[in-house]
Amino acid sequence: MGAASSFHLFWQLPAAARDARLVEVLAVVEILVPPRVPALYFWALQVDFVGPAGMWGGGHTGLQWNRRYPGNTAVNWGGYASADRGGAVLPGSISALPGFDDDPNTLSYPWSAGRRYRLRVHRSPDIAGAWRAEVTDMESSKPTVIRDLWPGQPVATNRIRRYFWRAGNASEAGAEPGFLARPMVWSEVFAECGDPSVTVRWSELTAVDEEGIAWRPDAVSVNYQAERDGGCQNTDTRPDLGGGLLQITNTSRAFPQGAGIPLH
């Protein structure tokens, strides 16, 4: 028993990109076999926010299977300040998507199993120092803005701003723009280890630097949450024949902790 918890794919970017100042990160996710239980599932693209003085924090955006929302489908863009900045939830804008006042990070979004969705994090065109996440249905090519986060601002300043910002009338946050680092994708699952198997597919992992150069990881390294910390022994990550990466629950584990999976 226990929770399937978290398993991650850390991107191994080419050596020439490791010191690049990243300003955009993208990944495509597809829910191939959707959940069949009411537990929460979250499939996300994660980045660190880095400024001149070090790390500001991290953010994650992705699709959720969440029974609080119509059809159990939702999207999220949220994150936390770094420990030396207090570790608080990062402030951000009010989304145009429907949601709940007590959780501005998670919004209703009608994703469907078997469709491909591109997750994208980039500098906000509306607010200086903010980072925007959007999701695009690859069949319709329709992008949907989720919201903006302000990782570089003091949390106390933006906590007030968060509740009054609306698209089109925001004042500039005024933070230094910073850049992105350490991209990864992951699954976080709050189901039992023995619940019906779920499969998601990741592809088109891409990072773009401030010179406009697009970088693809050479490989990913696999990480599983330890069983003693609530992880399951029957989660797995494996490549497919189309160049994608599958994350699967309730299956045999073919790629162990720390394994590398080449992408070229």
State where each predicted segment sits.
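Short, flexible beta-strand-to-coil junctions
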Residues: L32, S124-D126, E188-C193
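Short, solvent-exposed beta-strand-to-loop segments that form ligand-recognition rims
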Residues: V135-E176
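Active-site-adjacent segment of 2-oxoglutarate/Fe(II) JmjC oxygenases
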Residues: W165-D195
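Long, compositionally biased interface segments
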Residues: G212-H264
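Exposed low-complexity, polar/acidic, P/S/T/G-rich flexible segments that act as propeptides
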Residues: P183-A226
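Short, aromatic/His-centered strand-loop micro-motif at the edge of beta-sheets
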Residues: G92-R118
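Carbohydrate-binding surfaces in secreted/extracellular proteins
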Residues: W111-I146
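Secretory/extracellular carbohydrate-interaction modules
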Residues: M1-P91, T106, T249-H264
